Amino acid sequence: RLTEKSVILAGGTDLMPKIRSGKKEPDLYLSLCRMEELKAIDRQGEWLKIGAMAAHTQASEDPFIRKYFTALAMACSQVGSQQIRNKGTLGGSLANASPAGDIIPCIFLYGGKIEILGENGIRSVDAESFLLENGCTLLGRNELITSILLPLEEERKSCFVKLGSRREV
């Protein structure tokens, strides 16, 4: 059972700097790194299911995402530095709920849903209700994001433009 100080470790790109600086002092790490099913990107009926552990690079290079969810592919290709894109996960970006999160507007744009696993099973929430405010989400204690669901529609046009002076962090 997770405690108040326990942390779920996915890519660790946001969490590890907080631990190193002393802002977080976990008593337990729950690593998701070996959960291959959480890295999958699959079509499931009328939805594209993106595992929460899918890395930004993986999503930016996925042919299905590039074709049907172009803005998301473009946003994923511009997150942080190459190292961050290789390790950082889409689920981690959502859980972090940063207002600077590049993928968050894209998930909203496409009417995405977030699947959350907790003690009572899996629940699905609209992406727009998942994020409450800067750094706050609907995630309860002992819950984790398992996937992002995007509705499949006919091919649509979209793009992502990052506003800012830096090319990489």
Region locations from a protein language model:
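C-terminal structural segment of proteins
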Residues: 1-169
